Structures are given as structure tokens and as C-alpha cells.
Amino acid sequence: MRWLIPLLTLTLSLAACVDSADTPPVESPEAAQQQAVQQEQPQPEQVAQTAQQQEQPAAVQNRLEASQAEQPQARQLAEETPDTPFDPDAVEMAQLIFWGPLDGFFGRYLPIPPAGQALLDQLLAADSPAIDKYIIDLSAFPNPYWEQALDYLKRRYGEALRTVYDSPEIFNFHPEDRATPAYLRFKQALFGSQFEDMAEMMDPDAAIVIDAREIQWGGVRVDGIPPLEFPTQVFPDEAAEWINDTDIVVGVEIDGDARAYPIRIIAWHEMVNDTIGGVPVSLAYCTLCGSPILFDGRVGSEVYRFGTSGLLYRSNKLMYDRNTRTLWNQFSGKPAWGPLVDRDIRLKVLPVVVTTWGDWYEHHPDTTVLSIDTGFVRDYGPGVAYNDYFNSPLTWFNVPVKDDRLAQKDNVYAVRVGEALTAYPIEVLAERALIQDQVGLLPIVVIATANGSGGRAYESSNVLFESADPVAGTLIDANGNTWTIREDSLLGPDGQELPRVGGHNAYWFAITNQTDNGRLWEG
């Protein structure tokens, strides 16, 4: 199935080019200016002309001139010290980059200059643990060296590889290797050769708290998977002609404002910037790790709105904020690379539920639903977006941490209390209807949805629950009292309320690869 990655990349890239010019409204002119501009790609017959005649941006041209001046020095160093092992971290490997954004995707077919080929030959012949991170990038990102890098992997591992992700061994980095400043400069230059706005978010001098060696290109430009900005909501009768009772939706209610976001729509966009119940929120949906997470965008006096960077970390999307263009980890809600890393910021995770439209509508008759008229040209039919991926046990990108207690893509319901996180297997939750547990120091009760596709979590205080009826939306406690399941709380006798706790669905591999202290509930 890995052959689908290049096909998906092409499909998403082409789709990004045919979006309507009438984009959804944004919150401010500043946010609008920061949205990525959809650029036309050059035709094949223009490649030679592009390489020789078109003017490069000043930053790229200056880098190329500096590279040309440094390359003879690198070759001389290798010739004068032939017995010294080649260390790519001691040489500016950014010298390999001789093409620029104006060359487009066809830049990968440009002829390689002798100096670049000589440096690549040294890299591929080196016996150093430092080379792997460079080879991964050269074989995963479109560039003129891609075929040689992949051929190297085939020789090294003796496999009929189609992509670098068919060779997971190379991602087992040597314990002594690290993402050096020279490597960060190389990585920024490589990604900047195609996407300058993406490279701006990969500042080698900025603080970073994730391993840059594991940051990979997701196959699209910045906002190439276009976020929805304050999209239109419609009433159920308006959506009746296209929505089905069995459609899976992400249900949200804040201060009485109930909304449904069909997965079949948001899978094409992966980010929804909205305001619900007066709260500025971002629904960040990582399709690759199965996690629709609703973040409160307020941090102190700031309000953050987000876009899609086009980058991945351990098969999880890296989003970016429109204020500072810092890269954020979508799963943790924390800054990962950029100006905000040192601010000790963590976005608040708000509760969502993954259920069917029929179940959501039955219990929320006043709900609205995301309009299918998004302003973008997409096939929003049921089971279209990512259908093959959702129905496959395989991941498309590297995930280094394997935990065989569950399959990599088993669905879990993740409950968050501060820094603590516990994952509840959704199949088990559906069978039991309810689970009482403690996350961190907080006693909670987790309740399955009516169709068994998700869950809700609430503080349980000192109440012991004996049974739950997700279809009826009720629980029975040990004293025989009936409690009503609501989105903001459980409502019990004498008006007693137990508040909701933040939680969301995810694949198991997201828990093991994106958290340091994620716990699996095992009964």
C-alpha cells in the first residue's frame, strides 16, 4: 500500500491548485495575509528555462552563491585528508542545494553539478552514523538526489524499496547521533528549495523540543490541505439532502452552542478555525493518527489560530500559529519549534465526541452542522477521503515506538487531565458501556457512545456508577439514582452535576509516539 503515498501526494497537491479563489472568511487581515498563496507549478518544457533564465529570489540566490564559494573548500578538505572519516556534520551539507522554489516539482530532474555530485558521493560512501538523517531527507523530499539516495537504501538493505518508509531500520538513529546545527541548516535549505514559507518555520537558530531528524514532509505545501476559516453552519433540515444518519461526526457543545463536524468533510481540511459558544477554538484533525482535537485558542491575552504546515512528526501533523508561525505539536498542543517554545505554553483541550450524525441529532435537536458548501472543490462523499488509509492496519510514515499491547491503529479514547493521559480501547469501552478510573489524581467515569465509536469522560467525585445506557443517555449509580448524560456534565439527583473532562479519539500509535507518560487502561 506504500505506493499510495506518491499518488496521495500528487492528488493533494493538484487539489490544492484548483481551490476556489473565494476562500472562507478569516478573522483579521493579518490572518488573511498569512494564509499560503497557491502557486502554479511550471510545465515540463519550462524546466530548462526555469533553471537558467528565471531570476531566483534574493535569499535563494545569495545561498547559491555562498554554496558555490564553499564547495571547492569542501572538496579540498576531502582530498587533503583522505584517511579522515567523512563527517557530514562537519561539512555544510546545505551546499548540496543548487535549485530553488521557482524550479517547482520539476527541480528534482535538474542536472546535478559536479561539486554537488562529489559531496553526495562522499556522503553515500561514508561509514558514519551521522549520514542516516541526511539520507532520509534526501530520499523522502523531492530533489535531484532522490533516486541515488533510494538506490543507496536498496543496496544497504537488500530490499525492493519504493519509499524510504519501506526501510524503517534507517530511522533507528545511532545513540551518539543528534540533530546538529549543520543538519538543521541543511534541512531548512532542502525544504526551502521547494517551499520558502515552510522553511521559514524551520529556523536553525530557534528553540526546538522535538527531534528534527524525525520531522518529515507530508506531501503538501503550507496550507496545501486548506483549513476551514469560520465555515458556514446549517440547520439539520438544510443538510438532510446529503447527510446520512450513519455519517461519523465530531460533536461539540460549548455554552449551549451544539455543532457537528462530519469527518467526511473535515478529513479534507484537517483544521477548522471557529468560534463556538463565544470561545475561539481550533479543531485540529490529524487524519494520519485518527485524532480530532479541539483546542481553546486563548492563552493569556493572546488568541491563536492555526494552519497546516505540511510537516509531520512521527506521523502526526505539525500545525503552525498565524501569530508567530511557530510549529506546534498537534497531539500535545504545545509549541515544538520556533519563537513560542520557551514560553511554557500548552493549549487547553476541550471535550469532543465521535459518534454518528443520527445519534448526535437525536440528543441535540437544536444542533447545527458544518455546511458541505465549503468554498473548496472536493468530493465530500461518504468514505472518500483517506478511505484506504482508514481501513488499513498500516501507517504511511515512520512511527519508531511500537507497543504490541494494541495494534498500531487500534482506536482509543484519550482522556486528558493536566499532563496525565489515559487511553481506553474503544472496542472494550463499547462492550462495557462505562469504565470508572483515575487519571492523574482525578477520579473519572468514561462512557461509550451509542454506536460504540467514541466516548465521553466526566469527573466522578465520590459517585459509584453501576450501569450505563448510552442509547438512552443515562447512567445508574450504586444508590439507584438516574443520571443524565449531557455534553457539559452529568446531571444527577437534586441537580448535582459532574463536569466533563477533555478527551478525544486517537490511534494507539499516537499515544505511544507522542506522549512520554501515556497510560493504557487494561482493566
Feature map (PLM): residue ranges:
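C-terminal motif of bacterial Sec signal peptides marking the signal peptidase cleavage site
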Residues: 14-16
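Bacterial signal peptide processing site
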Residues: 18-20
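N-terminal propeptides/low-complexity segments immediately following signal peptides
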Residues: 23-35
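N-terminal low-complexity, Pro/Thr/Ser-rich intrinsically disordered segments
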Residues: 32-99, 107, 124, 198-212
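Structural detector for internal amphipathic alpha-helices that build alpha-solenoid repeat scaffolds
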Residues: 79-95, 108, 113-126, 136-137, ...
